[in-house]
Amino acid sequence: MTDLVYEQPLNEKIRSYLRLEYLNKQLGNNLNHDHQHRCFYPLFSLCELSERCDYRNEVLKDIERNLLQLGKWQELDHVDSEQIEFYIQSLAQAREQLQRPERCGSQLKQDRFLSALRQRFGMPGACCNFDLPQLHFWLAKPWEERQQDYQAWISHFDPLLTPITLLLQLTRSTAHFDNATAHAGFYQGDSAQALSLVRVKVDAAHGCYPTISGHRNRYAIHFVQFDQQRHSDRSIEFLLATCA
């Protein structure tokens, strides 16, 4: 078996970031492999989220906060100055892209092909060729052509997704995995420092998964046996990282 990593956000900002990261990974997977019409589901989910909420101001504030912190770290001894400089330059470039006036993904609303598909994709079984002949035609194109189309569509979200990837990398880097034990399947922790993300790495051979709850100063982890779908009463060894 292999180690599986589970993550639980402890605030709404990180919760939103993780959702967007999840969709971004699906977009990348669809760009590299021909998944036929399934490639549109994460694209339309991203369109929906970006229309409901303008993440730009929140992300820009987060970029500024991290640039300030990175600048302080840069003055310390025994730090990886190259890595810090990489994040400073990358975040500065991402900030410049995100400050452009147009909203991410807004131009896709003018695409008649995507608009027709999006109306149907929310309906069960409504992607048949008699419902969407234009989709049937597009799927018959060579993969290389469809790949170029898909790349052009998802590039509209790069100004948003690029800084979120960087910000989550920095968040995860604030803590290393340490050994921990859940006695009778339960573990509880607290922190004087405000936390934003709890990460649990556990061997799938244990046959269980964690359910994590909490807020920025306290969290609890319950392990559930998958086969029985009930709380485990065994001691579970796992790795824990609590990120600020």
Swiss-Prot record:
Its main location: cytoplasm. Keywords: Cell cycle, Cell division, Cytoplasm, Septation. Pfam families: ZapD (PF07072). Gene3D superfamilies: YacF-like, YacF-like domains. The keyword Membrane does not apply. It is found in: Cytoplasm. HAMAP family: ZapD. Belongs to the ZapD family. This is Cell division protein ZapD. It comes from Shewanella sp. (strain MR-7).
